[in-house]
């Protein structure tokens, strides 16, 4: 009898232990998973907040970036209007050479604009180039994207298109622009973009005629220096919390260019490119080189192939340097999660402005990167850019 009682008690005790262990095991599993989940949220964000909204612009004009960021923060579906606002703000504030006193006229003294915008969701592109008589070229480029089946309109036809949609006629060439052009003419039209012509393009203004092919020369290509305020193109990239991307660019073109020249701002993949499934990129530098290599497109495709933003940016710049040893310029790359990086060459350092991003450190903060060495440059110590200070009127606001 005593033995049966002991066995019964032992059985009950074993059942209780099994039940307790089961409860403890489930509780441990629950809290362990909860802890891992909390850690995942802390490191990477929830599924909803994994994407880091941000607004990036090239060079160090903080006010235009901040205006674009404020538009992006107004709600969903604002990436398009954000990049447009950034371009318009820079146009009105005369960022760099954009419409500043002594802007970038062509070799006939005329000031024309080019601009482009790209939708990363539909991969649609709208651009204008060589357009005279309209201040905010980005609005006309946006109209090309939204109201036509084309991607690029140029010259007087682009101006006529703008008029047909009600955009105000406003010719931008003024007395200051003419003075800059006259000074260039009095200096023998130096520098210019001609080659293998006669009379010599290094001493004369033309008109020119072609040299016979056996007299063609191949001088070392030496880039012009890019310094603070002496660039004529700015680009903006906007990414929202839903992963939607828009990129835009606006430019007054290379100074004293041959009339009719189209620059990188208007060419898909040269100055800007975006794909919501991968990310986006903006580039700045010698537009003719950028058009030959399409660095913004290459950067996005490099990320599609598995490279991280920093790897993609450096790979693109190294590729440019392999073919153009004196290249001056930069590329900024952003993946679809909002992780960004930049690389440059031919400058002491490259500046770009960021609002948002990881932890929202501050708004319109100027980020600086040291540039890659041009190890294979043919012209030793070729011209490089200098960016010693941020203009006082564009002091960095703190968020």
Curated annotation (Swiss-Prot):
Which GO terms label this protein's molecular function in UniProt? N4-(beta-N-acetylglucosaminyl)-L-asparaginase activity
Q: Which domain of life is it from?
A: Eukaryota
Instruction: Please state the span of the N-terminal signal peptide per the UniProt entry.
Output: 1-22
All disulfide bonds of the chain are 90-95, 189-205, 344-371
Entry's Gene Ontology cellular component terms: lysosome
Which InterPro entries does this entry report, sorted A to Z? Ntn_hydrolases_N (IPR029055), Peptidase_T2 (IPR000246)
Which Pfam families does its entry note? Answer: Asparaginase_2
Q: Which UniProt keywords apply?
A: Disulfide bond, Signal
Protein family according to the UniProt entry:
Belongs to the Ntn-hydrolase family.
Name-wise, this protein is L-asparaginase-like protein GG20738
What is the native source organism of this protein?
A: Drosophila erecta (Fruit fly)
